[in-house]
Amino acid sequence: MRAKTVINDLIFKVMQKFDLKDVCFFDCETTGVPAKGLKWDADFKQFPHVVQLAWSLGDKEKSYIIKPDNYEIPPETTAIHGITTERAIAEGVPFAEVVDEFLADANAAPLVCAHNIYFDSSMLKANVLRYCGREYYDAHVEDALHKGKRIDTMMKTIKFVGALYSNGRPGKYPKLEELYSKLFPGETFPAHDALEDIRALRRCVPELVNLGIIELAQKEYPAEQLKAQFEPEKPKGGRNIEFHDPNPVTEPIGTGEPVPEPTPEPERPAVPLNSKTRELLNENDF
């Protein structure tokens, strides 16, 4: 146990703690999920589009449908979130206008929180590069969404909610509906509306804090882990994101997907951070 603490101390330091009013909750609905192997920085033109973006900060709530820019919303994703191409054209606001307002609030907030934050932040980053350009990205996105501010309720609740293998290891990434049902038995909410999702998430977080599963605190990472390098990367296989965890999980692609059962490995002593460990840390954009 002490070895794990030492390693984590080297990875980041927990900074000042905050209250719920200091958290910017956000969620987006999209035209789909990225094809396997695509990277938001190198392959942003091939990423799906954002269909709806909602967020809250303190008493403020915002929700916008995005006006399509020469693309169609596939029927299979409309079946999930209910937003058609026709509705988005009639009611939508250009992505650049919406994301500018969101990033102003996210930048002002000490913490940002989402369920599967890697997916939502990657979708936003890719679409910022597509519609706003790299100069805008550099000026606005890194500070607003940097990993030291992030809270990911999906990754934090895998063991709390997820179905388990026979050996006790986590079997899947929990959907927000599953987390909500676990915390509030018998209750539901209208999932896959971005605004309703953040309302549900905002209700879950205080319960998770009380259970000791998450804390409302910033983390300080080495500077080299916080900036995107915008260099194409070769696709890599599953990567362990919990160092020296007896029940490791692999990096998510989408909410609710099964986690491949890892091959048991012998106990290994803790080692100081080396170049390979730093490389793994740098790849995991959480």
Regions found by a protein language model. Give the residues of each.
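Metal-dependent phosphoesterase core characteristic of DEDDh/y 3'-5' exonuclease domains
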Residues: 16, 21-22, 36, 45-83, ...
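Acidic, proline-/serine-/threonine-rich low-complexity intrinsically disordered repeat tracts
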Residues: 245-273
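Metal-dependent phosphoesterase signature
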Residues: 80-102
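N-terminal accessory regions of nucleic-acid-interacting proteins
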Residues: 1-28, 32-35
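Short linear clamp-binding motif
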Residues: 3, 239-246, 270-286
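N-terminal intrinsically disordered, compositionally biased regulatory/targeting segments
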Residues: 229, 261, 266, 283-286
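Short secondary-structure capping/turn segments at boundaries of alpha-helices and beta-strands
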Residues: 12-13, 40-43
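Flexible, glycine- and charge-enriched loops at secondary-structure boundaries
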Residues: 44, 88, 92, 191
